[in-house]
Amino acid sequence: MDIKRFGNRQGKTIMLLHGNLMCWRQFENLIPLLEKKFCVYAVSFDSFDGTAETTYTTAQAQADKLAEYIEKELDGRLDLLYAESLGCGPTIFLKASPNIQIGRMILSGPEYLDFGVLNRLILKVMPQKQYRTAHEKYMPAWALRFMGQTEQGMQTMLRRI
């Protein structure tokens, strides 16, 4: 995991968590707009940190690493946590952590996904699947693997939301 700090150290703290197949550079056009007023932390998760030495295992593992960093470097407090797609999993676990205080959270879904001619079909099917997942608190094994999540981790997350 790699965490870059930018901006005003006296300002409110903002942490940015990237989406899948991205790294902290996903926010490189946003950071200059924020850094004069805020202290900005841009994160690259394991497997996305450019070292080829780490592996993204679960959202919980990433949240644990972030919690350790936030406790040590920021006294356990963030003013704002922004998460894009993949970053939303660790964000939920951070919010549930008793040692981390987060003033505000913004969770942004996979808005950049475009399935072309399949968009209409996916929009007819996916909302029902998402409702079923939230209602039954069940996620298929293939989806858990795709998200880098375990059944236990998903059940914990679903109980807390």
PLM regions and their residue ranges:
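Conserved alpha/beta-hydrolase catalytic His-Asp/Glu region
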Residues: 117, 131-161
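Structural signature of beta-strand start/N-cap positions in the alpha/beta core
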Residues: 13, 39, 78-80, 102-104
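Active-site signature of alpha/beta-hydrolase-fold catalytic machinery across serine-
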Residues: 29, 93-97
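Membrane-interface segments of envelope glycosyltransferases acting on lipid-linked substrates or membrane lipids
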Residues: 20, 44, 64, 110-119, ...
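Active-site loop/oxyanion-hole signature of alpha/beta-hydrolase fold enzymes
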Residues: 41-80
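Flexible "cap/lid" loop of the alpha/beta hydrolase fold
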Residues: 96, 102-133
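Gly/Ala-rich beta-loop-alpha elbow adjacent to hydrolase catalytic centers
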Residues: 82-91
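Conserved HGGG/HGGXW glycine-rich cap/lid loop of the alpha/beta-hydrolase fold
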Residues: 6-52
